[in-house]
Structures are given as C-alpha cells and as structure tokens.
Amino acid sequence: MSSIIQNPIESSYFVEDLSAVGNSQLHSGRSLTYGDRKANIDTRSGGGRRFWSNLNDSGNSFGAVPASSMNLSYGPTKSATISSKDGAMSRSSRYYVSSELKATLPSLDGRRLSKRNAANHASHHRMPDESASYRTRGEYESSSPRVPQKSLRRYYSTRTAQRLDVRRPASRSSRYSKTSDLPPSDPGRFVDDSDLTPHTDFTNRFVDSDFDPDSGVGRSSSPDQMMSRNNNLNINARMTSTSSKPYAKENQQLISSMAPVEQKNSFSTAREQYVAPALSFAEPVETQHNHMPKTTPLRGTSTVMNGSPIGPYSSSSNATGMYGVSKGHSSSTRRPFFSDVGSSQPAEEFVGSSSSHGRQQDSYIADDSDSERSYRRVRDQYLSKPRLSDKNRYSTFSEFPGQGTPSASQSNLRRSNTVRPTSFYYEKLHIKNDNPSFQALPYETTTQERKPVVKPDSIKTVKPEKKKSKGFFKKLMHKISHIFD
C-alpha cells in the first residue's frame, strides 16, 4: 500500500513514499531521513512505530508516526473505525486522514496547520499518543502518560509556516535567525572585493579601524588603493607597472588644471584640495612623518575654493595628510619608484638623519645601523613596563614556558620572591648573571661567601647508613636466589 509519512512538526516540504522503500527494509530498522530529521524505526513494536528522536521528551505523543497511513488530517474528517484491545471504538479523528487526500492538498497544509496549531495542542484530552497504524494498533499499547507537547510554538511558529509555504526546509540552525534567507557563503573562498566585513574581524589584513577611518566604505584589495590607505612593509612588492605612472616624462610637466576654475555650484563647503605641484625626476615627493609621500591624484576636475591661487601644499601643515583626496577614487594615485626619484640630490626625507646613504636605503624600515640608538630602544623596552616576576613571560601565548632568556623555574621564582626585592630599574640585558636560578640584580652582590658550619662529631656519627645498604643487598640477593631454585 502506498502511504506517505509527513513530519508533523514542520509540515515538511519533503514527502516520502513508503512503497519505494520495501517493507523488509522498514522492519530491519533502517532509518529514513525527512529534510534534516532522522526517523528512527523502533523494532520493539514490530517496526510499526517510528519516532523523531529530537522531539522525544514528551513520550512521543505527537511525534509517533504510524508505518502505513498518514497522521495529520486537514479537516474534521471521519476516519476509519479503529480497533484496539479494549474493543472496537469509533471516534471522529482530526489526526487521521487517507494518504490520497493528503497528496491532493499539499498547498493548503502550511497555512491550515498553522491556524489550527494552537487549538490542537491545547486540547490534550485525546492526544493520539497510542497512535500506530491501523494494523499495528492492536499489538501495541503505550504506557506513556498523555502530556501535551512541551512548547510547540517554538518548533512551529507562524514564521515557520510562512517559510514552509515557500517550500524552504526549516533547519534547526536557521529557525531563529533572520539572515538565514541569504545564501550561505563559502568559507573556503578568498576574500572578494564585494565582501564587507565588520572591522572587528581581525583576519582581514587590509582593514585596521584605528588607523584607517574610511575602512567602512568600500573595500578593495587592489594594490594601489591599499598603498594609499596603509603603510605596508610590503609596499614595494606590489607597486603597479611603470607604464601607467602619472608623473612626468622627459621634462614634460603634468599639472592637473592650468587655470583656477571658478565653481559656482559646489556641493560641499568642505576645504577643497590644492593642485599637486608639477613633478619632475629631480625633485622628490614630499613626505609626511609617517612616510606616506603627499601625492594628490592628478585629475582634471580639481577645484580651488574662492579663486585662491594654485600652488603646492603649504609645507607647515602636514597634519591633515592629503586634502581633497577621496579614498574611493585613489586608484589614480601612484607613487614614484625609489629609483625614479633621482640621486642628483640626496633625498633628506627618505634617509632620516644621516643623508650619507642616498637612496639605497629603504625608507620604510627604521634605520637601526646606529648601535647607540638600537641599544636605547631595547633598553627602553625593558624599562617601560615593570615585569611581574612571578608570571611567565610567555604565558599568554602557550601553555608551555617559552624558550626565552634563561630565567628561574616557577618554584624557584616563588621562593626567591620572598628572599630578595625585585628591582624594576636594572637593565636585564647587560648584567652578567651566570646562575639561572636567581633573578638578575641591579647591583653587584658583595655578600661574602659563607662556608658551611661543620661539627666534626656529627659527621662521624652519620656513617651507619652504609650498614643499612648492606642488609638491603643481602635481602635482595636472598629473594633473587629463590627464582633460580
């Protein structure tokens, strides 16, 4: 007989025909899947009773699904007369209906079910908790009490009903979330230009909300945009090709607009940008303190407020950085290569204090060649923060103690805390301290060596331990000899 099992809780969009699965398979306890639920077959009752394992708490009152014919009715239909152990009893059942009717009215089921839902479960006087198929019912009587399903609204709400009308499966995880309608994104794919991630996402190496206030707008991984946004150590590696450079070739100077443009209808009262100075190979681009050269994008539309004359930036204010440059269009901004800046004048900005190295030096890396300065930097690092002596330096990073400067083991540390005061002012690096079990001290220790106190009598009295060991060996040999008997 062809019959249909429907998941009663979610009025599932997926209907399975039992005749496809042979009866032998049913009795062998093979589980069927509906949407995302498993229907387990209970072999104790002759394979007749099938229950939803995750709704199990209420004695299967609502979840029990008969093997052969359909549970939930779609109107107060008179069903067949049901025979039970007590005798034949006929009742009008809202719960049973023939599978044909069910197959005819798939469209109604979501809406109707949701309407009748509350009323149905409120009336627990006759919950079909001994519901089994017409055949099986005689053999099987359940002992479980009749308890209404605990909180059915949680499982089947109006929203769920609407969702099922659109024939979307309601999965456990998506049940409460509103975003569940979006297509799931594939975690394995690379971050795309179109992706917008919140700035708290630390996996995104292009966005740092502290230093880059525009990060919320549009995000693009194209190298020249990144160049204008970040100070990247990697920056040389992703410079764009030489052909597209907007600065001057062979003394021909590029200026964004030759005459000041009066702008009658300006949309923004904001401070407008000045035009970039003409660039030639000889003069290096101005640099701010953060090593970002101040290059304005050279665009034809540059505006000058109030007819003020075109000119370079005033050198005094480098605080605001680039004036009118909107980060969105900064793809036109390019940086000169270091090789192009020209060695004719040593570029002061690139080198820092010592101009001797000319342009060979990479301006993005701090100049550590001066030993005095690097020593000072490391020393300051140690002086700046008092280090708590009882804590392992690397405890934040792993469970295991780090392989750092040899320092005391934990037990030693605890002991030596009481022995000597810790001083935070010494420079750990420069004190020669061969004994790893002590903390380095800010001064040379001048305590005289104390020789151990010797009481000559007590030393001679200590001897009898050796006799003990002799007796021990005798006993041991005696035991061993038994093995070889």
Swiss-Prot record:
- Outline the segment boundaries, as ranges, of region: Required and sufficient for plasma membrane anchoring: 451-485
Extract the ranges annotated as region (Sufficient for interaction with Skb1).
1-200
Kindly state which keywords UniProt assigns to this record, in alphabetical order: Cell membrane, Membrane, Phosphoprotein
UniProt modified residues of type Phosphoserine:
S222, S458
Where does this protein have compositionally biased stretches of type Polar residues? 171-182, 218-230, 341-363, 394-416
* Residue numbers spanned by region Disordered: 117-230, 286-416, 446-466
Where does the UniProt entry say this protein principally localizes? membrane
Where is coiled-coil annotated? Answer: none
Please list the GO biological process terms of this entry. lateral cortical node assembly; protein localization to lateral cortical node
One Gene Ontology cellular component = lateral cortical node
Places the protein is found: Cell membrane
Composition skew (Basic and acidic residues), residue ranges? 189-198, 371-393, 447-464
Please indicate which superkingdom the organism of origin belongs to: Eukaryota
Q: How does it assemble?
A: Interacts with Skb1.
Q: What does this protein do?
A: Acts as a membrane anchor for Skb1 in forming plasma membrane microdomains. Promotes mitotic entry by sequestering mitotic inhibitor Skb1 from its regulatory targets Cdr1 and Wee1.
Name this protein carries in UniProt? Skb1 localization factor 1
The gene it comes from is slf1
